[in-house]
Amino acid sequence: MKEFIINENEAGQRFDKYLGKLLREAPKSFFYKMLRKKNITLNGGRATGNEKLSTGDHVKLFLSDETFGKFAGVQETVARAHQKLDIVYEDDNILLINKPVGMLSQPADDKEPSLVEYLTGYLLESGAVTEASLHTFRPSVCNRLDRNTSGLVAAGKSLTGLQELSSLFHDRSLHKFYRCLVNGVIKNEKYIKGYLHKDEKCNKVTVQETETSGALPIETRYRPLEDNGTVTLLEVELITGRTHQIRAHLAGTGHPLIGDYKYGRRTLNDEYRRKYGLKSQLLHAYRLEIPEIEGRLSYLSGKEFTAPLPYLFQKILKEEHVEENK
């Protein structure tokens, strides 16, 4: 027999929808049959599956371990927190994590763990989630960064947090700021627009000034913080959030990111690689500003969160004399 107590993440849905998540490999006919035979009960009584679940409801499944395991499906291996996460902020609904360079934001295949698996491992170890609760709700990230871009990634710890924070990212309510080091000298703040087209085969984008079929509109704002006569430290506000937007948009203006071999200048990148061991673009999701918002996350209104630059990024800024001074 298996017993489950409905939590806040599971409440509000129909009982049959919940069972469909819990017994993901079972045909609907199976759990309707089990409901009729009272092999599945709700609060100790017979149920039809149409009931709306409430927090604290008791669900019992009078099934063998073998049957439950068969229909619940094999749970993928959770990567425990072998790599300690840099938690910038955490409450009952959300987390903000400072993702390091080299870590995937979301799973790309079955072999390499991503931030999602590390997050799940962290929450399991802290007791915030259980193996049982993961059958029906899995915490996940609300935004993605490229593997070799570091900085703030937001995650939903509860269903409310995941849904509402994802919505804020989707409708561009949040203000997202990056730090990057680019080739060339930039003296003035600028707002730039364009159209981005992605080549799925080579995972590379191009930016054009005029609209073409399949291209998506992009908007970027940047302001210089410091330069040394050769390179410039920028603060970039990502207004839209397209694939490789900052990297391709700045490269299109003649100021590619240092370390970016996909869109940048190999000769200069090789110089930084020899000098500092730099293998990827110097781009960091630095600050997240939350405006006045309504709903369950309204307590976050007006808050601002920052993630410190990685050590190598800081070292290069210091050695190249482009540390921020304003």
Put a short name on every predicted segment.
Residues M1-K201, L216, P308-E320:
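RNA pseudouridine synthases
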Residues M1-K33, D65, R80-L85, T212-E219, ...:
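Pseudouridine synthases involved in rRNA/tRNA modification
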Residues G44, G229-T230, L234-E237:
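Short histidine-centered loop motifs in beta-beta connectors
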Residues T48-K52, E235, S280:
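Short, surface-exposed secondary-structure edge patches
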Residues V88-Y89, D146, H197, R223-E226, ...:
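Well-ordered beta-strand positions
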Residues L165, R242-L250:
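Short beta-strand segments enriched for Tyr within beta-sheet-rich domains
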Residues V182, R221-P224:
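Conserved hydrophobic positions within beta-strands
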Residues N203-S213:
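Short aromatic-glycine motifs in intrinsically disordered, low-complexity regions
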